[in-house]
């Protein structure tokens, strides 16, 4: 797929070969451009690759309900979220038409458990497996780290309003001086 995706696969394969449980959850629609041989190499190395919300004729009414959860959690203690674009045009500086810019954020502390929970919910939807216990939610991940507070809201498209829509609506409705 390109330098970014190839670099990612190299690291995932390395960790899987060192007996680290590596879970990769891909949106079945948004990840279609990934090549089958790229996926096969990951699986052959022991990476657990799972497709979320596969398109079927009987699920077409939900085709637009895609997952945009992009999360990396390392040992339940360090978390990243952001765009995680795998195409090479994300390597650019964002100042040119053919070069985009990507931003990702690193977290430690209680927010990591929230990132893990977002991933775990999608993983459970796709596989039926509940990711629980110290492997995914170590007690140390709930301790405060640093002096910056962060919160995370997980929301996935569904029928009716989502938690994110309600959060923003209530936040806007609660404004008293500025918005």
In which residue ranges do the predicted regions lie?
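Charged, low-complexity intrinsically disordered terminal segments
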Residues: 1-178
